[in-house]
């Protein structure tokens, strides 16, 4: 009897603890949802003679990001600036009589070159309305400075710094490390320039990869330097001389003498500049409106029109399943659902991806073809910083493809990469294997080197994937297979060159794609935008994914900018290891 009561009390205690924990979790979820809702519904008023303040810090994202429960609970919420909201706010501010000008507060933005170019172009259009832009920084990163050159005047702290250095790329190579630990990487590929596998095979860049990097980095820098020169009223030779001069070491007086900046002043002194520019009383403070607050005001007023354009965001690595990036098991149903929505008049796929799983890329491509054939509605692609390899695969069938001049695209090639750990097991830790099989046709595994027959079969598998990739591109672009092969071979192209060789139709951002589609729909000033995937907070999904997200977050936080290499290595060795992705590089 005593044992019975002990067991019963233990069970009751377990029930009460479970109830308490679920109740606590529910309270936390309600708090998170309430805080999120409150932040979304924060409204501000815009007085006359106001200044739109754009703070270049944190991270620029293509769109507003979904709620991350771990960030909400810990308070670790990095500042994010959705590019689409920023551009819409700048365009509206150009016609808003209450906004006199823009103040760029530069504090080290994290963004891709295509994002920065799109933002800068929006600022240039703002100036064309006759309004002014001023920029200030204690320290200008090169990205900050590129955007700031759209301003009428560039100010800097008297003991500040400006870093203009051109572009360089850095790649880590692991061949010697893998040799030391006894891991061999077995690679089968198609494409002379398909360099994504090189970090596992070589200790330095191949001649072909060096050649392609020099080409696209040079073209991208020429575009950036040209815009900087245009903004500062100098020639590109002057900008290149700045990039060769270690500008970070120059005194601000020298920066002004070289016309890199206009004036030196402390931050508080910019208040007087802005008060004078907005014609306020001398003892007034400038009337600042933060761009995110301003964008929130616009979002409450927009989405009215007879036509609806769907913008579907495809961002990250392409895989078959998972919680992050572009997964075919989530994106394919989304595309097919859009094909059935009668209130959607056109689709723009916004791609920011260096590729991934070839199988998943094909499934997404096919779903988009279904959208076209079932609806007959216009379908465009807008490329972000990168839409290469698998990112180009899912893009190639669009009616029109848009890219920024500095977008990285192309990389039409395929590879398979399978690690062989038998030396690690045998020689390093003394583990041996023995395999008994009924037949020879096994897929290569991690525990043994590929046999000649397996390698031949893998090469045939990769060749077939490459031929299909090329065929998809040729059909989508309306050209011959041979013409695609001439520019394929895994080569990465900058957007400007891609437009010249037929991989891209128009140079411009998402705003241009929207304007062109609206014109095609005869709805230039009468359309609304619906964004997908839906970002509504689903707390049950967050709870279910919390454990896996935490594990991935810890590993990838430690790896930092090299986390993508970890993800690629993790995917290899599976049957879906046929990859169409470009190399991971860090561009400085």
Model-predicted segments: where are they?
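Cleft-lining beta-strand/loop regions that shape enzyme active-site pockets
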Residues: 50-171, 300-424
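A short, compositionally biased domain-edge/stem linker segment
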Residues: 33-44, 291-301
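Charged, glycine-interspersed solvent-exposed loop segments at helix/strand-loop junctions
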Residues: 171, 175-275, 422-517
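Intrinsic disorder and flexible/low-complexity segments
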Residues: 304-309, 313-343, 461, 533-588
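Hydrophobic alpha-helical transmembrane signal-anchor segments
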Residues: 3-40, 49
């Amino acid at each position: 009897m005593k044992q019975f009561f002990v067991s019963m009390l233990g069970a009751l205690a377990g029930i009460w603890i479970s109830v308490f924990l679920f109740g606590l979790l529910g309270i936390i979820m309600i708090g998170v949802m309430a805080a999120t809702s409150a932040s979304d519904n924060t409204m501000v008023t815009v007085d006359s003679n106001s200044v739109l303040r754009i703070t270049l810090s944190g991270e620029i994202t293509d769109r507003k990001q979904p709620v991350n429960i771990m960030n909400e609970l810990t308070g670790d919420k990095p500042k994010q600036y959705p590019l689409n909201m920023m551009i819409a706010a700048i365009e509206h501010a150009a016609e808003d009589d209450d906004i006199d000008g823009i103040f760029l507060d530069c504090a080290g933005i994290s963004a891709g070159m295509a994002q920065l170019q799109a933002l800068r172009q929006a600022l240039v259009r703002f100036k064309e309305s006759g309004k002014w832009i001023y920029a200030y920084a204690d320290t200008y990163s090169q990205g900050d400075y590129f955007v700031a050159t759209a301003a009428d005047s560039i100010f800097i702290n008297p003991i500040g710094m400006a870093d203009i250095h051109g572009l360089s790329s850095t790649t880590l190579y692991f061949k010697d490390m893998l040799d030391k630990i006894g891991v061999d990487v077995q690679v089968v590929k198609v494409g002379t320039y398909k360099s994504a596998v090189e970090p596992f095979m070589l200790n330095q860049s191949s001649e072909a990869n060096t050649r392609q990097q020099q080409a696209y980095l040079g073209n991208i820098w020429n575009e950036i330097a040209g815009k900087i020169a245009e903004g500062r009223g100098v020639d590109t030779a002057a900008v290149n001389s700045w990039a060769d001069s270690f500008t970070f070491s120059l005194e601000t007086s020298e920066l002004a003498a070289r016309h890199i900046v206009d004036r030196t002043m402390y931050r508080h002194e910019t208040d007087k500049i802005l008060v004078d520019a907005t014609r306020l009383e001398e003892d007034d403070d400038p009337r600042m409106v933060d761009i995110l607050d301003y964008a929130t005001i616009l979002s409450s007023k927009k989405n009215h029109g007879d036509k609806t354009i769907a913008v579907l965001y495809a961002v990250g690595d392409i895989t078959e399943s998972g919680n992050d990036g572009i997964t075919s098991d989530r994106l394919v149903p989304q595309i097919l659902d859009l094909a059935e929505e009668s209130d959607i008049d056109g689709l723009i796929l916004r791609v920011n991806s260096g590729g991934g799983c070839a199988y998943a890329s094909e499934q997404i491509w096919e779903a988009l073809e279904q959208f076209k054939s079932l609806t007959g509605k216009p379908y465009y692609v807008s490329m972000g910083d990168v839409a290469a390899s698998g990112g180009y695969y899912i893009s190639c069938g669009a009616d029109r493809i848009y890219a920024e001049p500095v977008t990285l695209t192309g990389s039409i090639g395929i590879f398979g990469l399978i690690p062989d750990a038998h030396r690690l097991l045998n020689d390093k830790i003394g583990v041996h294997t023995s395999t008994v099989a009924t037949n020879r046709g096994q897929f290569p595994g991690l525990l043994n080197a590929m046999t000649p027959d397996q390698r031949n079969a893998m090469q045939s598998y990769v060749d077939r994937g490459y031929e299909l990739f090329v065929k998809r591109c040729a059909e989508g672009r309306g050209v011959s297979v041979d013409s695609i092969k001439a520019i394929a071979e895994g080569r990465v192209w900058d957007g400007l060159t891609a437009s010249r060789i037929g991989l891209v139709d128009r140079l411009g951002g998402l705003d241009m794609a929207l304007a062109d589609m609206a014109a095609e729909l005869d709805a230039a000033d009468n359309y609304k935008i619906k964004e997908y995937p839906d970002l509504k907070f689903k707390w049950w999904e967050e709870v279910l994914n919390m454990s896996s997200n935490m594990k991935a977050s810890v590993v990838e936080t430690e790896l930092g900018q090299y986390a993508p290499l970890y993800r690629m290595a993790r995917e290899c060795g599976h049957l879906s290891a046929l990859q169409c992705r470009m190399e991971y590089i860090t561009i400085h």
